[in-house]
Each structure stands twice: as structure tokens, then as C-alpha cells.
């Protein structure tokens, strides 16, 4: 079920369920408030909310304790090549925007717990038990292994609040409420697989091979691609599932050559994907390769090189696009691109994880101010309130914050879309396919058919089946 969304653009409305995400480890969990790696004072302590006027929950008026924001980070494991970039994405909106005038007067202090070695469940526990995190960033594809622990923690503490950039493997009907306050910036992984098939069909591909590494989010997206292909009428010649982080995929490239598909749908990390394509090109193949959002990371082209691009029919990724026509983008883009330690190290503002992380963190902070509290009970409904009409439309953190403090309702219009979320806490984004140019640069995004995407995602979306005690299977 979809919450009401304003009609700033018909495409955004149609894409309420057509959501895209990539599935996505501790180098020492030092607190940071500036560039990644900087240290500050001791971690914040959790402050119990009180009830203010009008029934809103508010923090104690004299509280200036820092708020511990703990990122579930990727410094080891399959996603290690871009772990530092993902951390910069979290630090940027906090250091450069939010902490200039933090919500409720409490500065945010960041910690980064590597999940690549110890696992996501242990990293999340460390955030809560050692750092007293009031905000945990990016619960992700390992959530099912510790959901019971989190539900108990939320029930006992009414905390933490959870904006997530990598939560697309979590079913769309989980989240978005005080008892499970997860809000996802980029959508659902099954829509990513579907989008790849939609693009393949749009270029006339009648047959595909689906290649996926054995990571939950990639497996989910690959399964969705199979279902979407069946719904559309595209023939899946084979699905090839392989372990992640292998030094070579030459045998798989040879099998793809023997199958001779019109296109290959790839659900794998940037390095594995580039290795496969490079080895396929060396074997003489020329195909359309349709990947996932991680390909935007520099490691993809760094591993692939530019020579294979010219030899292939097409190389690009199905993802989502940004809205560069609003004041929100006019503020964000130059700030990212010109601030040392961000654009100069991790690529331009147009890279997907940069702008999607920025948007969800800004909306998180605005919802805290609007709620008057860091409690999940107050924050979860506030995430809807600050992004949905009615309210004064606003585009930047400072502008929106001033309106909230003046007692006005706001309607935040961000850079990923209208700021609206489904009842399950999934952001509405605009699906697209983005090609690579011959020099390795990113080309112009192709927006996919919104109505067709909506029809298909309703057929293939994964939902959790839950009992009366909120024990869920998926």
C-alpha cells in the first residue's frame, strides 16, 4: 500500500513502487564529525525523550550531548573496494550540512563499524552496545539474521532510528513504523533486477543470461530479473550463480559465449562484474551488459579498463536517476564537488550512492527536528510528515529547518525524488539505465517506462509473511 505522494512530476508518482537499490566492513570505530577518519570527543549517550506541548515528544531542553551515528561500514569483504567512499557519503551531509546547525541542538558524531569480517549482526550490536547509537545507518542484506534482536531492542529502548542506503534486500512491507523504524533511500533490490530486464527488452533483446554472485541482495535481484523476464516474454537461457570475490570468471564467460544471448544481466560487485566482462571481451564476445548500481564506483572502470567498452554492444547499469532541476540539487552538487575529501577522491556528485545517502540523511535530520525527539516513536511518522504534503515546499536543510522552527509544516523536495516513502519506508525513485561512454565516463541516463515498471513490480515484489507476534519469513 502506497502513501499519498504529491504530483510534482507524474513520473515520480507512477514510480512509487518501482524502486531500485543495490545490495551492498571496522578499521577502528573512531568518532568523526568532519572528513572520514577525524576523531572527536567521547561518544554520545542516549537521552530519554520527554513529552512536550501538543503531545509531541521532545528532548530535555538543556541537552547538548552529541548524537552517536553509527554506520554499518564495508572496509573488508566483497564491498571493501568502495567502503571508504560509502563512509564519505555518510560523513558528508553530517559534517558539511547538518552539524552547521544540528537538529535539537545536538551535534552528530559518527562511528563506523566494519561488517565485512564480523558480520552485520555483530557490527549492529557494537553500534548499540558500545557506542550507544541513536542513529544506525544502513541496516542491509544481513538484517534477517538479527531482526529478532533489533525488534527487542526497539521495544525496550524506542531507539535507534535507521536511515538505510543498502536495505534493498529487506521486504518492502517491513519498516516505516515506530516498531521497525527503517527508511530506505534507494528502493528494493528486486526492482533493480526488473529494471535490467526492462532495459534489455527496450533494446530488442529476446534472450538473456543472468549472472549473479552468491550475496543475498544480488540473488534477490537475479530472482526478480527471472520473474520479470517471464512476465515480459524475454527468454532466460541460463542463470549462472557463482561465489563472490573470485580472481577469475573465465569459465563463466566461456559458457555465456556458448549460450549466445542478446544481453547479460549482471548482479555482482563492481570488481567481479568488470572481471567477467573483461574476460568475455578477451574471448571475442560482443554483447549488451546490464549491471547494477555498484558499477558507478571507480573500481568498476578501474578493473575493466576502457578497451572492452568499445568492443561491446553496450555496458551500463540499471539504477535510478537524480532530479537536477530543483534548488536542492543546486545546493548539493557544488558543495560535494568542491569540498576537499569528497568529489576529488570519490567522484562527482552525480554518483548514485553520494546523492541518495545525502538525501536520506537530510530528511532524517529534518524529521528529528520536526518530531522534537530521537525516539523511534516520534521520528518514524515525522519522516512521512516532512516529505509529504501539505506543507511549505522546501529544498535545503537550512531552509526547511528554519520553517520547522517557525512552527510550519514542510514538504521536503530532495534530489532523489519527492521525499515520499511507501508505508514500508521505501523511497520513491525514478528508474533508469545509465550507459558508459567509450572513455569510461558515465553517459546520459535513460528513464524507463514508468507504467510498465509499476505493473511488473506489483507482480514480482517480495513481501514478508508475518504472524501475530511479528515473526516474519521471506
Where is each model-derived feature located?
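C-terminal motif of bacterial Sec signal peptides marking the signal peptidase cleavage site
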Residues: 20-23
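Bacterial lipoprotein signal-peptidase II cleavage site
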Residues: 25-33
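Beta-alpha junction/loop-to-helix N-cap segments that form part of ligand/metal-binding clefts
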Residues: 26, 66, 81-89, 96-176, ...
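Extracytoplasmic "Venus flytrap"
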Residues: 59-91, 113-118, 141, 211-219, ...
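Hydrophobic alpha-helical segments within soluble ligand-binding/sensing domains
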Residues: 120, 184-209, 220, 248-250, ...
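Extracytoplasmic ligand/sensor domains, especially the bilobed periplasmic-binding protein
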Residues: 132-244, 288-315
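Extracellular/periplasmic periplasmic-binding protein-like sensory domains
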Residues: 280-361, 368-374, 453
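Segments of small-molecule ligand-sensing domains
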Residues: 342-351, 367-445
Amino acid at each position: 500500500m502506497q502513501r499519498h505522494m504529491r504530483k510534482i512530476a507524474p513520473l515520480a508518482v507512477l514510480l512509487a513502487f518501482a524502486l531500485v537499490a543495490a545490495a551492498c566492513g571496522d578499521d577502528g570505530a573512531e568518532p568523526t564529525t568532519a572528513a572520514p577518519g577525524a576523531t572527536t570527543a567521547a561518544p554520545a549517550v542516549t537521552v530519554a525523550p520527554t513529552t512536550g506541548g501538543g503531545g509531541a515528544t521532545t528532548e530535555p531542553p538543556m541537552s547538548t550531548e552529541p548524537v552517536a551515528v553509527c554506520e554499518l561500514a564495508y572496509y573488508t569483504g566483497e564491498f571493501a573496494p568502495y567502503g571508504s567512499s560509502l563512509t564519505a557519503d555518510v560523513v558528508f551531509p553530517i559534517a558539511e550540512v547538518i552539524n552547521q546547525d544540528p537538529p535539537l541542538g545536538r551535534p552528530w558524531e559518527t562511528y563506523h563499524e566494519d561488517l565485512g569480517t564480523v558480520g552485520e549482526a555483530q557490527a549492529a550490536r557494537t553500534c548499540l552496545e558500545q557506542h550507544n547509537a541513536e542513529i544506525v545507518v544502513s541496516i542491509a542484506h544481513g538484517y534477517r539474521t538479527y531482526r529478532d534482536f533489533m525488534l527487542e531492542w526497539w521495544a525496550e529502548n524506542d531507539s535507534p532510528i535507521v536511515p538505510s542506503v543498502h536495505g534493498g534486500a529487506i521486504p518492502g512491507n517491513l519498516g516505516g513504523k515506530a516498531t521497525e523504524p527503517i527508511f530506505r533511500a534507494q528502493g528494493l533490490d528486486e526492482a533493480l533486477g526488473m529494471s535490467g530486464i526492462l532495459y534489455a527488452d527496450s533494446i530488442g533483446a529476446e534472450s538473456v543470461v543472468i549472472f549473479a554472485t552468491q550475496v543475498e541482495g544480488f540473488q534477490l535481484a537475479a530472482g526478480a530479473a527471472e520473474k520479470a523476464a517471464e512476465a515480459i516474454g524475454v527468454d532466460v537461457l541460463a542463470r549462472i550463480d557463482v561465489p563472490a570475490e573470485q580472481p577469475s570468471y573465465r569459465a563463466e564467460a566461456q559458457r555465456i559465449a556458448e549460450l549466445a544471448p542478446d544481453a547479460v544481466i549482471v548482479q555482482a560487485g563492481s570488481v567481479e562484474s568488470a572481471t567477467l566482462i573483461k574476460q568475455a571481451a578477451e574471448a571475442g564476445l560482443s554483447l549488451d551488459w546490464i549491471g547494477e548500481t555498484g558499477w558507478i564506483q571507480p573500481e568498476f572502470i578501474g578493473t575493466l579498463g576502457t578497451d572492452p567498452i568499445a568492443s561491446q554492444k553496450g555496458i551500463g547499469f540499471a539504477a535510478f536517476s537524480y532530479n537536477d532541476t530543483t534548488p536542492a540539487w543546486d545546493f548539493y552538487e557544488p558543495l560535494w564537488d568542491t569540498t576537499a575529501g569528497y568529489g576529488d577522491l570519490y567522484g562527482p556528485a552525480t554518483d548514485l550512492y553520494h546523492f541518495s545517502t545525502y538525501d536520506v540523511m537530510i530528511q532524517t535530520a529534518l524529521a528529528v527536528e520536526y518530531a522534537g525527539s530521537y525516539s523511534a516513536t516520534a521520528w518514524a511518522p515525522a519522516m512521512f510528515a516532512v516529505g509529504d504534503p501539505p506543507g511549505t515546499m522546501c529544498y535545503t536543510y537550512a531552509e526547511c529547518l528554519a520553517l520547522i522552527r517557525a512552527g510550519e509544516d514542510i514538504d521536503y523536495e530532495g534530489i532523489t525524488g519527492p521525499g515520499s516513502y511507501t508505508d514500508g519506508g521505501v523511497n520513491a525513485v525514478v528508474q533508469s539505465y545509465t550507459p558508459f561512454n567509450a572513455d569510461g565516463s558515465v553517459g546520459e541516463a535513460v528513464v524507463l517506462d514508468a507504467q510498465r515498471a509499476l505493473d511488473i513490480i506489483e507482480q514480482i515484489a517480495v513481501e514478508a509473511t508475518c504472524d501475530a507476534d511479528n515473526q516474519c519469513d521471506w
